[in-house]
Amino acid sequence: MQQSAFLELPKNFYELVLPEPQQNARLVTVNHSLMDELNCDLSDKQLLALASGNLTDESLINFNLIPLAQKYTGHQFGYYNPDLGDGRGLLLGQWHDKNNQAWEFHLKGAGRTPFSRRGDGRAVLRSVIREYLASEALHGLGVPTTRALAIASSQEQVQREIFEPRASLIRVTPTHIRFGHFEWAASLGKDALDALIAFVIQHHYPELAELPENEQAGALLKAVCGRTATLMAKWQAVGFNHGVMNSDNMSIIGETFDFGPYAFFDDFQIEYICNHSDVEGRYAYNQQPKIGVWNCQVLAAAFGQSVTEAEQTAALDHFVQTYNQQYVSEMNAKLGLATQQETDKDLIGDLLVLMDKQRVDFSLFFRRLAKLGHADENDLRRLLSQPEEFEPWFERYHQRVAQEALSEDKRQQRILNNNPSIILRNYIAQQIIEAAEVGNFQPLNDWVKALHSPFENHPGLAEFQQPPTPEQKGLQLSCSS
């Protein structure tokens, strides 16, 4: 491993902090698929030391680590908070894969830092398992996301709403820099802002370094807005509600970042709110694209000392254009369509209105749309409380499919390739957590393996490919998760 490149930034961007180790910790799980992708040859003993925070002076030297807590600010539920930073996580260092891509190793649940405020800096088994599951589920679905490498846990109890077992997780991503880092840099002045812009371009957008120097900051802002728009489109298409889209939870490289009270849809509800702390619905499913552009406006304002007003406007326009194009593209793929037409947006929108009205299971509807017009199409119609209301839409869909150059077999295959047979529903995550809390981690490992290939049939998980019971649906969580 190597020391984090983040240390190249001015010292007011971080504090050096050692983790508060877990005592008698065990390695709960290792993401061997990710280990292979990273060409990572760390032993289980080494991973346990990293994941549990048991880093002695010798191990710090051997690993070549200088752990640090990052300082940033951000807008939380629309209000600026200047007192943010890594309150329970530490950037340990970075690993280079065989392509020399640097991957940051970040320890979530590392203990208190100067930015913990009144928190204890710890994480619990429930929350790290939820992050592990969600990041791997999104990765399997083709949605940009941070990843999870390993989990460690111990018998130490941490007080939340109840006492829960302490745990920690190694999060992996090329960078943990958030929109909030730029808000912090802007508050420090133009020199700090320019230093952060130059750092991000050098390490994460190197193609922009070829532009004239006075165009680079504006190009970076535009690129980040574009990636964020693409991410929003993908979230909407897979039925993912993040729940806490504060600007300090927005990745500068357009990845899903910081998993709390998230949810994948059971029944489709356009105004669904997964976070029961979000009483006003600011981060409801249908608000996510709007909040995405709102956060980009915050980012553009933070760039204000280094870009022109015209560059800010161009970046935000780029978000809107990118989102509109990407969203239709993602949804058309779910419908088995290979081309785009002007009427497709209405076809998609009208379908979602029907699904919302009848509370149709989101993932199962699109998966079973492959059966429309076939002997087993009743598997699709059984999802509908009033199938007759869908008939006009089905007719429009048939007409639209007829305009494609795809055979029926290819339409079906395109649908199956773009709609998962299994999805990480909240009740499934809760079952996995409950098993883990009594020492059974097999369901966790089995599900992570399955979530890496969600478009396959998985006959062993057939019971999870049916609509959940009323008791299993709509489980909401709070930010404490």
Swiss-Prot record:
**Which Pfam families does UniProt cross-reference here?**
SelO
Q: What EC class does the entry list? A: transferase
Q: Which residues bind ATP?
A: G85, G87, R88, K108, D120, G121, R171, R178, D258
Q: Output the Gene Ontology terms for molecular function.
A: AMPylase activity; ATP binding; magnesium ion binding
UniProt-annotated catalytic positions: D248 (proton acceptor)
Name-wise, this protein is Protein nucleotidyltransferase YdiU
Protein family according to the UniProt entry: Belongs to the SELO family.
The residue ranges crossing the membrane are none
* Region named Disordered: 458-481
Catalytic activity, reaction form: L-seryl-[protein] + ATP = 3-O-(5'-adenylyl)-L-seryl-[protein] + diphosphate; L-threonyl-[protein] + ATP = 3-O-(5'-adenylyl)-L-threonyl-[protein] + diphosphate; L-tyrosyl-[protein] + ATP = O-(5'-adenylyl)-L-tyrosyl-[protein] + diphosphate; L-histidyl-[protein] + UTP = N(tele)-(5'-uridylyl)-L-histidyl-[protein] + diphosphate
Record's function text: Nucleotidyltransferase involved in the post-translational modification of proteins. It can catalyze the addition of adenosine monophosphate (AMP) or uridine monophosphate (UMP) to a protein, resulting in modifications known as AMPylation and UMPylation.
Cofactor(s) the protein needs: Mg(2+); Mn(2+)
> Does this UniProt record's set of keywords contain Nucleotide-binding?
yes
Q: Which residues bind Mg(2+)?
A: N249, D258
The EC designation for this entry is 2.7.7.-, 2.7.7.108
Q: Which InterPro entries match?
A: SelO
Q: Which UniProt keywords apply?
A: ATP-binding, Magnesium, Manganese, Metal-binding, Nucleotide-binding, Nucleotidyltransferase, Transferase
